[in-house]
Swiss-Prot record:
It catalyses: 2 (2R)-3-phosphoglycerate + 2 H(+) = D-ribulose 1,5-bisphosphate + CO2 + H2O; D-ribulose 1,5-bisphosphate + O2 = 2-phosphoglycolate + (2R)-3-phosphoglycerate + 2 H(+). The record marks 331 as: Transition state stabilizer. It comes from Thiomonas intermedia (strain K12) (Thiobacillus intermedius). The basic functional RuBisCO is composed of a large chain homodimer in a 'head-to-tail' conformation. In contrast to form I RuBisCO, the form II RuBisCO are composed solely of large subunits. PROSITE patterns: RUBISCO_LARGE (PS00157). Mg(2+) binds at residues 193, 195-196. Keywords: Calvin cycle, Carbon dioxide fixation, Lyase, Magnesium, Metal-binding, Monooxygenase, Oxidoreductase. This is Ribulose bisphosphate carboxylase. GO terms for biological process: reductive pentose-phosphate cycle.
Length: 461
């Protein structure tokens, strides 16, 4: 049985409202269950100790100052498994170079050793609150979706839906076919991203692919009269490799460098990779991909943290945009209520699962919607979210269109315009060919979402 530390690391008389008003603590909410035979409060206190100044025994080197920065359990509800801990902001590591906060220190404390404690069955972080002073000390985004809207010639407020795709197949295209796939989409759409495994494969080296992609962009811009955007994957183990890829691409794009975003796989690569991109390339849109996150964020996982927490951290780190799933409308795990993830990262204040968070003017992070989306699924998605100020990267939804990738891109745009106009999708399809052909391209979705569509659109098997 662990040493009971509740007299030091718990104070259930503390009021959450007072802690928030004081502005000196980061508050973290968990779902925590002790292992059988362990007391809830004692386990919670041990959890707080391991997450701050303590260990499993008293040590002789502890002094009064140390006790002043203890993390404190201030709320528990054993029946609902709710546990909340207040962490003094002095606990968290600061940069030597500029005194700023870092997410690695936050993660090390609030979701570090406590994930492997012998008396804890599970503990999952579901929300956290950051006071104004700590908000000021995180980098936050340098660019946001308004920068992209400006490039696209749109209003910088409520500039609307950015129709994007992912080059498919995700691997196996050589440089010329890769660039041709980009060109075909750009004839109808706005934004292309590398799929997360695409980098510098021997059959598609970066130094051959990127010049061809830029040439494809210029040709598409000339043909359509519209600006185009490309998000390049610079994910790598090594800082110098990341910068080598980024610097090469910036040189290639030259006068169109503002149309180049940098994608980092922030979950597998870690916070250091996100910060490298944010600080070394503050003029570029920072595209946070989250491959692998489901290992801990999935509702089926009892440990780690939620997708909501991951997205909220990404804004602090400086992500211009982060993938947030499809809220139950695509192929990825999720549900309609996940829209709160989008609201938290795009608004200046928002109610989370537990805490009301103010961002004090920190730039927003764009929700990026990806994973099994196509034109037929978009109207319902927008209705659930309540707006269309997102980037949507639809790979299969574009390259799977029966006519062409350009037609697929146009069908995505038309789906947004359909929702924006409050139109009936079937009636809208009758006047918009690419959207109508999306019904034939994705008949399984059409049957499920719009029963009777064949007769209404005059399409027969």
């Amino acid at each position: 049985m662990a040493h009971d530390q509740s007299s030091r690391y718990a104070n259930l008389d503390l009021k959450e409202s007072d802690l928030i008003a004081g502005g000196k603590h980061i508050l973290v909410a968990y779902k925590m269950k002790p292992k059988a035979g362990y007391d809830y409060l004692a386990t919670a206190a041990h959890f707080a100790a391991e997450s701050s100044t303590g260990t499993n025994v008293e040590v002789s080197t502890t002094d009064d100052f140390t006790k002043g920065v203890d993390a404190l359990v201030y709320f528990i509800d054993e029946a609902t498994e709710d546990m909340r801990i207040a962490y003094p902001i002095e606990l968290f590591d600061r940069n030597v170079i500029d005194g700023r906060f870092m997410i690695v220190s936050f993660l090390t404390l609030v979701i570090g050793n406590n994930q492997g404690m012998g008396d804890v069955e599970y503990g999952k972080m579901i929300d956290f609150y950051v006071p104004e002073r700590a908000i000021q000390m995180f980098d936050g985004p340098a660019t946001d979706i308004s920068n992209l809207w400006r490039i696209l010639g749109r209003p910088i407020k409520d500039g609307g839906y950015i129709a994007g795709t992912i080059i498919k197949p995700k691997l196996g295209l050589r440089p010329e076919p890769f660039a041709q796939a980009a060109y075909q989409f750009w004839l109808g759409g706005d934004f292309i991203k590398n799929d997360e495994p695409q980098g510098n494969q021997v059959f598609a080296p970066v130094k051959k692919v990127i010049p061809l992609v830029y040439d494809a962009m210029k040709r598409a811009q000339d043909e359509t009269g519209e600006a185009k955007l490309f998000s390049m994957n610079i994910t790598a183990d090594d800082y110098h490799e990341m910068c080598a890829r980024a610097d090469f691409a910036l040189e290639v794009f030259g006068p169109d460098a503002d149309k180049l975003a940098f994608l980092v796989d922030g979950y597998v690569g870690g916070p250091g990779m996100v910060t490298t991109a944010r600080r070394q390339y503050p003029n570029q849109y920072l595209h946070y991909h989250r491959a692998g996150h489901g290992a801990i964020t999935s509702p089926s996982s009892k440990r780690g943290y939620t997708a909501f927490v991951l997205a909220k951290m990404s804004r602090l780190q400086g992500a211009s945009g982060i993938h947030v799933g499809t809220m139950g409308y695509g192929k990825m795990e999720g549900e309609g209520d996940d829209r709160n993830i989008a609201y938290m990262i795009e608004r200046d204040e928002c109610q989370g699962p537990v805490y009301f968070q103010k961002w004090y003017g920190m730039k927003p992070t764009t929700p990026i919607i990806s994973g099994g989306m196509n034109a037929l699924r978009l109207p319902g998605f927008f209705e659930n979210l309540g707006h269309g100020n997102v980037i949507n990267t639809a790979g299969g939804g574009s390259y799977g269109h029966i006519d062409s990738p350009a037609a697929g891109a146009k069908s995505l745009r038309q789906a947004y315009e359909c929702w924006k106009a409050g139109a009936d999708p079937i009636e809208y399809a009758k006047e918009h060919k690419e959207f109508a052909r999306a019904f034939e391209s994705f008949p399984g979705d059409a049957d499920k979402l719009f029963p009777g569509w064949r007769d209404k659109l005059g399409v027969h098997k």
